[in-house]
Swiss-Prot record:
Source taxonomy: Bacteria, Bacillati, Actinomycetota, Actinomycetes, Kitasatosporales
Record domain Tyr recombinase: where: 1-196
Active-site residues per Swiss-Prot or TrEMBL entry: 29, 58, 148, 151, 174, 183 (o-(3'-phospho-dna)-tyrosine intermediate)
Source species: Streptomyces fradiae
Protein name, UniProt field: Uncharacterized 23.1 kDa protein in transposon Tn4556
Example GO biological process: DNA recombination
UniProt cross-references to Pfam families, sorted A to Z: Phage_integrase
Family note: Belongs to the 'phage' integrase family.
Keyword entries, A-Z: DNA recombination, Transposable element
One example GO MF annotation: DNA binding
Gene3D superfamilies for this protein: Intergrase catalytic core
Length: 205
């Protein structure tokens, strides 16, 4: 699988490998994953809360923070579980994904977006997108993969493996069935495997 080959490349930094694997296994939106803090992680349960796109507010007060919104749960599996401890290296607070430098002078950054141990700032969407493009572009800057492709690929692969519409909606957290049906586009390989069920003497019939 192309995603596995990309993550296995030696020149790819551990931060990027972890981010890409987590995006794929959670089928989460990039902004959701980039917004997760270490203290949000449930390592044993392989899950974490995240502020989803269009998250409902718990109150109407001004200056709302993350805790003022209804959070949704993202689930990951063994690949992310192996990489996260290596990435964090004992850090227990602050953003999971950080830059390799401190914010510039005069730049106002929320305390939640700063690692209290290193002073490094949260990795932004633009930075994460540029890093992915750097490793996947073949026809110049801007021609590489988009971060959303991990979510799309995850849901497509689940659809090909027979996940039901309801399960895909639960995993993706889409509210409308029509937004999920597009992932039910089986590959030629999946159609060939399905066709094999019609072979003479197939015991499953």
């Amino acid at each position: 699988m192309a995603i596995d080959r990309l993550i296995a490349r030696r020149e790819v930094h551990l931060r990027e490998k972890t981010l890409w694997r987590m995006l794929y296994e959670t089928a989460g939106r990039s902004e959701e994953i980039l917004g997760v803090n270490i203290e949000d992680l449930d390592f044993a349960g392989r899950r974490c809360p995240a502020k989803a796109k269009g998250a409902k507010s718990k109150s109407r007060r001004r200056g709302q923070v993350r805790e003022d919104f209804v959070l949704e749960t993202l689930y990951w599996d063994a690949g992310t579980a192996r990489l996260l401890p290596r990435l964090l290296k004992g850090r227990t607070r602050g953003p999971v994904f950080v830059t390799h430098r401190r914010p510039g002078p005069g730049k106002v950054v929320s305390p939640r977006d700063i690692c209290p141990d290193t002073g490094f700032a949260r990795l932004s969407y633009g930075q994460a997108r540029a890093l992915l493009d750097h490793h996947t572009a073949v026809r110049g800057v801007g021609t590489g993969w988009d971060l959303h492709e991990y979510r799309h690929s995850a849901l497509t692969h689940l659809g090909e493996q027979g996940a039901s519409l309801l399960m895909l909606m639960a995993k993706s957290r889409h509210k409308k069935p029509e937004n999920v049906r597009r992932y039910f586009k089986p590959s030629p390989e999946a159609i060939a495997e399905l066709t094999s069920l019609l072979a003479p003497g197939n015991s499953s019939r």
